[in-house]
Regions:
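N-terminal intrinsically disordered, cationic/polar leader segments
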Residues: 1-62, 69-99
């Protein structure tokens, strides 16, 4: 029995394709899917911060796990090359007003 060959994949950006910078991501989960909501944190004053959400992406649980695996590997590669990524201990997941 022969192993099927991989198809030649051609990546094409649709006219709606956009790139943007996000320094905020919210994750919402249901039994059917994961929703990643990307945004930018915009300080308004010393006591007010606004999060401007600009894109929501739904993923199946399987695709969310595949993304997790890919991100894990790429973070490991990044830290091997550039050093450990330090997180602000005050901003651990689940500590803010949006989880």
């Amino acid at each position: 029995m022969s192993i099927p060959s991989q198809p030649n994949i051609h990546l094409v950006n649709t006219p709606e394709y956009r790139e943007g910078y996000a320094n905020s991501v919210q994750v919402r989960v249901s039994v059917w899917d994961f929703l990643l909501i990307f945004g930018r944190v915009q300080p308004q004053s010393a006591s007010k911060v606004e999060v401007q959400n600009f894109q929501g992406i739904y993923l199946s649980p399987q695709q969310a796990k595949a993304l997790y695996t890919i991100l894990q590997q790429n973070l490991l590669n990044y830290e091997t090359t550039f050093g450990e990524i330090k997180l602000d201990p005050r901003m651990h997941p689940g500590s803010g007003p949006v989880h």
